[in-house]
Amino acid sequence: MRHQRVDAGGEHMNGVYEALKRTESGERRRGEAPAADDGATRDEGAAGGIRPAPRYGVGPALIAGNDRYGAVNDRFRVLSARLQALAAERDRHLFAVTSALAGEGKSFVALNLAVSLAQNGVRVLLIDTDLRTPSLHWSLRLNPLHGLLSYLTERIDFESSMQATALPGLTLIPAAAAPSAPELFACPRMHKLIAAARAAYARDYVVIDCPPALAAPETQIVARLADALVMVIAANRTPRHAVARALDQLAGCEIAGLVLNRFEPSYSRKAEYG
């Protein structure tokens, strides 16, 4: 199986610039397999309208907390520690995760970041807003029919959209696959969901898995509703100009962290998953 690496970068724009330089090889070398987008679960109980945790297993993309992937776990701990510092210093609690293009592993990063945060004893709400290719429900073995889409179309309320997972502290609002509908994210209902998430997790964390920035105009809407943004870049796959375009489209969003997926510098210690 293909071995991959994750590297958590800095929050400042010079970190973004260095990452852009590292992706230059991606303009000449393509074809890398995308990161797996399946994962795991935590149990928060059924109180407050949250659906009971399932009794299913854990998907292969969940590596946070698995000793087999120690070095990669360390990268997620670094990233989660950075976000916790932002929460303490600047009152940032709601983070959007995206990438420039599809297949860069942003759902993998969102899932494992959420789990890494929850392992610190806080509650985490993970929201899948990628209606084009939703994956978190599959990773966590949950039913996507009662989630974001049902909420946005006014079929259920906020509490009913949340589903407890098999991992303590982690709750998911899943997404069912649907055609592109940016207007759903621009409606007052989406703003109401974010406001409800902020109120319910005011002392904890919300992680939003957004669609790829260059593929979905709704990402600009969702990212601007968040406190800060985590950008995922496939180091040997994503063209530099694509990352630059994505950052231009998301101008004004605070960069909370940079994740280089499949990051393979010769000086880095090896960290494998697959």
Placement of each model-derived feature along the sequence:
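Generic detector of well-ordered alpha-helical packing
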Residues: 19, 129-131, 210, 262
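Hydrophobic positions on the alpha1 helix immediately C-terminal to the Walker A/P-loop
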Residues: 109
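Pre-Walker A (Motif I) flank of P-loop NTPase domains
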Residues: 91-95
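C-terminal lobe/tail of nucleotide-utilizing enzymes
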Residues: 2-77, 241-274
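Conserved NTP-handling cores and scaffolds of large molecular machines
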Residues: 20-27, 83-87, 117, 121, ...
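Active-site signature of alpha/beta-hydrolase-fold catalytic machinery across serine-
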Residues: 112, 116, 138-139
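Conserved catalytic-core segment of NTP-binding enzymes
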Residues: 183-274
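P-loop/Walker-type NTP enzyme "switch/lid" segment
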Residues: 50-81, 85-88, 99-104, 122-202, ...
